[in-house]
Amino acid sequence: MKPEKVIFVDESLEKSFNGLSEIDPIKKALIRAIKTLQEDAFSGRNVKKKLIPKLFIQKYGLNNLWIYNLPDGWRMLYVLTPSEEVQIIAVILDWMNHKDYERLFKF
């Protein structure tokens, strides 16, 4: 299912993304990931509810979390939200390296 749009959770995250160099491999991977999400909102891996970090539940009030694998062990985290109960919006919450990802999920 195609989402209505893919957005960043807040302006500071979007500024971080826009601040990345055009030749940065992470920015290129994020752009590819966004294009993939625009075609299929469910292209990531769904996190079981009991494994969603409490920090994210408290900070964003979310009830679902998706992980999109990026190259070199990086991960992009996003949530799917309903828009007028018909369309879906994919909201990018963060991207992180594998070490930070493991720390967040307590692996």
Predicted regions: what is each one?
Residues 34, 38-41, 72:
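Generic secondary-structure microfeatures
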Residues 2-4, 18-19, 65-107:
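Enriched for short, Lys/Arg-rich terminal
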Residues 22-23, 51-57, 79-81:
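Intrinsically disordered, low-complexity boundary segments flanking structured domains
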Residues 1-36:
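Arg/Lys-rich, positively charged N-terminal/basic patches that mediate binding to nucleic acids
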Residues 39-68:
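A short, surface-exposed loop/turn module that caps and links secondary-structure elements
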